[in-house]
């Protein structure tokens, strides 16, 4: 039975925001005191800190909502996951694609060293956005004139990253919606391109730049395809917080970076061809309900559960001691202050939910304009 949202947002919000502020504070101290002297040591510690926060979101998906992620991969891809630097390119299908990536990274042992190219506004989100900034996520303004230098600088600084990392790049530039698909189809018709049915037309400038810079130190590109089966409801943050489950199928295919074309034009064509093939792959999945590759076991490790229990016990003990010491609930002013704090937490969680919703992302008109510029 679905749980009323109001009974979920407040306790989960308090848990995530308070633990997140603690993690953010430690990250800030380490950024100032350690990173200037040893970037490698800072990254190793920050990897652990990031997992202390991000594993709570993995727990929400895995244990609270019981979302099932089914991985399809060939033997080479499956054995390589988490053991090497990798550039991840994926279709952007749902509100929680980034969380699905975190789940797969956690299963592969590299959650704390996952990275992504994201829109600039993401880094201003309290707790989660700040943690991503400290973890060296790349934030772009969706204007190539401004973003080219930022992207190149951000990628070049990863050359000495001490642990295997995954860098996710959503080359479609925005989440898939029917309106954006229509805009992409109109543009494809005007340019004599294959009309997409299940994906958007990739924006390849960022991908070409990434391959050009990373081919010397990143051995692989993981072509990732995400789809929700027809008989399963679309996963959203709202549904997950309500404890409502879903099923997500993910197909991953490793491509050796050494086999990538050399010229920028050919790299761009390679990316576009991958998405044409991905479109056909999704057509086949819609018809058969599965991918051809073998289903790989990824389980549901208890690590995220243990981390969430740790934070729950720590913060509950701290809250009890705090209210004993301050006697905050013994006065009307204290009660009002506490109520205001809870309202603030609820408001911040509402912002998180709204931020994740695809229908609130870029409009179809903006999507059409971006495709034309590409």
UniProtKB/Swiss-Prot annotation:
Its EC number is: 2.3.1.51
Q: What SUPFAM superfamilies is this protein classified in?
A: Glycerol-3-phosphate (1)-acyltransferase
Question: What main location does UniProt list?
Answer: membrane
Q: Example GO molecular function term? A: 1-acylglycerol-3-phosphate O-acyltransferase activity
Please tell me which top-level EC class this enzyme sits in.
transferase
Name the reaction it catalyses: a 1-acyl-sn-glycero-3-phosphate + an acyl-CoA = a 1,2-diacyl-sn-glycero-3-phosphate + CoA
* Keywords associated with the record: Acyltransferase, Lipid biosynthesis, Lipid metabolism, Membrane, Phospholipid biosynthesis, Phospholipid metabolism, Transferase, Transmembrane, Transmembrane helix
Q: Which ranges belong to the motif HXXXXD motif? A: 92-97
**Cross-referenced InterPro entries, in alphabetical order?**
Acyltransf_C, Plipid/glycerol_acylTrfase
TM region positions: 15-37, 48-68, 121-141, 305-325, 335-355
Q: CDD domains of this UniProt entry? A: LPLAT_LCLAT1-like
Membrane topology summary:
Multi-pass membrane protein
Q: What subcellular compartments does it reside in?
A: Membrane
Q: Please give the biological process terms from Gene Ontology that the record holds.
A: CDP-diacylglycerol biosynthetic process
One GO CC term, this protein: membrane
According to its UniProt record, in which pathway does this protein act?
A: Phospholipid metabolism; CDP-diacylglycerol biosynthesis; CDP-diacylglycerol from sn-glycerol 3-phosphate: step 2/3
Which SMART domains does the record associate with it? Answer: PlsC
Q: Which PANTHER family match?
A: 1-ACYL-SN-GLYCEROL-3-PHOSPHATE ACYLTRANSFERASE PLS1 (PTHR10983:SF75), 1-ACYLGLYCEROL-3-PHOSPHATE ACYLTRANSFERASE-RELATED (PTHR10983)
Function recorded in the entry: Converts lysophosphatidic acid (LPA) into phosphatidic acid by incorporating acyl moiety at the 2 position.
UniProt note: domains = The HXXXXD motif is essential for acyltransferase activity and may constitute the binding site for the phosphate moiety of the glycerol-3-phosphate.
- Belongs to which family? Belongs to the 1-acyl-sn-glycerol-3-phosphate acyltransferase family.
Question: What is this protein called in UniProt?
Answer: 1-acyl-sn-glycerol-3-phosphate acyltransferase PLS1
Q: Which gene encodes it?
A: PLS1
């Amino acid at each position: 039975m679905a749980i009323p949202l109001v009974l979920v947002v407040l306790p989960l919000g308090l848990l995530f925001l308070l633990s997140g502020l603690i993690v953010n504070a430690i990250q800030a101290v380490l950024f100032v005191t350690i990173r200037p002297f040893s970037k490698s040591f800072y990254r190793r510690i920050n990897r652990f800190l990031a997992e202390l926060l991000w594993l709570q979101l993995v727990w929400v998906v895995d244990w609270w909502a019981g979302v099932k992620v089914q991985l399809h991969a060939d033997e080479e891809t499956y054995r390589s996951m988490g053991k090497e630097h990798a550039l991840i390119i994926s279709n952007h299908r749902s509100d929680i694609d980034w969380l699905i990536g975190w789940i797969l990274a956690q299963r592969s042992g590299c959650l704390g060293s996952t990275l992504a190219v994201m829109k600039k506004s993401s880094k201003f989100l309290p707790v989660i956005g700040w943690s991503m900034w400290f973890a060296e996520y790349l934030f772009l303004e969706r204007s190539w004139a401004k973003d080219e230098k930022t992207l190149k600088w951000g990628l070049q600084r990863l050359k000495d990253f001490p642990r295997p990392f995954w860098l996710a790049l959503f080359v479609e530039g925005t989440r898939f919606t029917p309106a954006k698909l229509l805009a992409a189809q109109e543009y494809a018709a005007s340019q004599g391109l294959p009309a997409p049915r299940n994906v958007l037309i990739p924006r390849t400038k960022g991908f070409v730049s990434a391959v050009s810079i990373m081919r010397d130190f990143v051995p692989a590109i993981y072509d990732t395809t995400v789809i929700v089966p027809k008989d399963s409801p679309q996963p959203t943050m709202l549904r997950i917080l309500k404890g409502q489950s879903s099923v997500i199928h993910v197909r991953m295919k490793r491509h050796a970076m050494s086999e990538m074309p050399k010229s920028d034009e050919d790299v761009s064509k390679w990316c576009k061809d991958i998405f044409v093939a991905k479109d056909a792959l999704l057509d086949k999945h819609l018809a058969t309900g599965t991918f051809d590759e073998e289903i790989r076991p990824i389980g549901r490790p208890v690590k995220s559960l243990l981390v969430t229990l740790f934070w729950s016990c720590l913060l509950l003990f701290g809250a009890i001691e705090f209210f004993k010491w301050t006697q905050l609930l013994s006065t009307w002013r204290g009660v009002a202050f506490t109520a205001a704090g809870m309202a603030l937490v609820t408001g911040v969680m509402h912002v998180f939910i709204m931020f994740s919703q695809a229908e609130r992302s870029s409009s179809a008109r903006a999507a059409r304009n971006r495709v034309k510029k590409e």
